[in-house]
Amino acid sequence: SAAIDYARHLAPFVAHYKEDLIVLMRVYFEKPRTTVGWKGLINDPNLDGSFDINSGLRIARKLLSDIAELGVAAGTEFLDLLSPQYIADLVSWGAIGARTTESQLHREIASGLSCPVGFKNGTDGNLKIAVDAVGASIHPHHFLSLTKDGRSAIFSTTGNEDGHVILRGGKEPNFDAQAVDKAGSLMVKAGLSPRL
């Protein structure tokens, strides 16, 4: 597949820069929609409206496993609240998107993930919601969800100390030094580490 070919091309860079930089491959399986449309490989892997989610999860998991075997770390956006149960053990970095950063449920899921999780600023460029999400995800949470075998369970998390803000723009770009300083100041004000 094209994804595996890309991972093969990326692998030498992972090895070359391993002392100074963590290189990972962006592998997104879910597509947030403002209204309607194709929601991604997990939801509709055949691109035909059949919504064969079981196959989508299997394909996603196999792809992540194959990428890991090549020595390449994978990063993905966690959109659906249940799919992390099936793929999170193969994900080295996660993102919570601009449309879901304010969601209490996504903050709770992030608090239990075993990888660093970045929260994107809002679609309007609002940084505070991302900072608040990082602050919420570092704490333990308790919530109802489903286990891998489909049983209802109460989950308890210990918090995720590796949360961070993703500057993704909004009404205008926000990757300049002033925007980074503003994000750092908001993190400090919230009692969080502004590290890069």
Predicted feature residues:
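Short acidic catalytic loops
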Residues: 1, 193-196
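Single-stranded RNA-binding surfaces
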Residues: 4
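Active-site-facing alpha/beta catalytic cores
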Residues: 7-184, 189, 195
